[in-house]
């Protein structure tokens, strides 16, 4: 029921810290071979949110898996979770590398903490960028210059209600531009993750269809943000099968 969820306002902590929860219409893994700053890529693409991507080496080459529309830019021996984007454009935390894919350090899955072996430079307390998924499907972006360990970041994301999460590059690479603020860095990064927030028009189109097709009742349409019970979900799925 992602399409009927309303946007959560950006949560602004001290300067250099941004968190935003929103319904995502589509996302894109961006390979920054021309070393453009995030602000320029945001202007050129029209995305609503943009954050730095995953780790890279001294030659400005991504490490881990970077796949753009089926073309492998970089790879490693691991087949762990990452940001996976299929034909529908929706970002998910999966292992599927068939469409577009970007590696990340798995932090949470179904609300449980995940542990992975980290090199000292990644394990140390540092500024952090992360992508999370709420139980209702909305995206939670975390971009914070405050130094945090992995466990501290996990606890903060759990406190926001995040179910699944991946940690991206951090330290001096941490940067992001959101609709109501930014976390800036002068460092160029080879990969970025772009998001387009679902518009009110898109949400209303989904609701209008749901009402006309009888998937949602008038009562449910009056409060589309209300949590759907298991019984109501079963009724909706049953109607779809008819």
What does each model-identified segment do?
Residues 202-215, 219-242:
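Short, solvent-exposed alpha-helical surface patches in non-cytosolic proteins
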Residues 1-201:
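Gly/Ser/Thr/Pro-rich low-complexity, intrinsically disordered segments
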């Amino acid at each position: 029921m992602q399409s009927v969820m309303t946007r959560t306002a950006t949560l602004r902590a001290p300067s250099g810290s941004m968190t935003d929860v929103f319904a995502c219409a589509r996302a894109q893994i961006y390979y920054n071979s021309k070393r453009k700053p995030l602000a320029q890529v945001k202007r050129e693409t029209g995305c609503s949110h943009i954050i730095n991507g995953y780790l890279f080496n001294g030659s400005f080459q991504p490490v881990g898996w970077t796949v753009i529309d089926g073309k492998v830019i970089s790879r490693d021996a691991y087949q762990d979770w990452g940001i996976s984007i299929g034909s529908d454009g929706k970002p998910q935390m999966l292992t599927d590398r068939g469409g577009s894919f970007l590696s990340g350090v798995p932090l949470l899955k179904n609300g449980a903490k995940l542990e992975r072996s980290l090199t000292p430079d990644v394990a140390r307390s540092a500024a952090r960028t992360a992508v999370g998924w709420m139980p209702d499907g909305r995206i939670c972006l975390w971009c914070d210059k405050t130094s945090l360990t992995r466990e501290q970041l996990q606890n903060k994301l759990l406190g926001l209600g995040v179910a699944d999460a991946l940690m991206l590059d951090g330290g001096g690479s941490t940067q992001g531009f959101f609709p109501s603020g930014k976390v800036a860095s002068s460092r160029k990064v080879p990969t970025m993750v772009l998001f387009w927030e679902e518009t009110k028009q898109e949400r209303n189109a989904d609701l209008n269809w749901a009402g006309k097709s009888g998937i949602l009742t008038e009562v449910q349409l009056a409060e589309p943000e209300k949590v759907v019970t298991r019984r109501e979900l079963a009724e909706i799925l049953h109607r779809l099968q008819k």
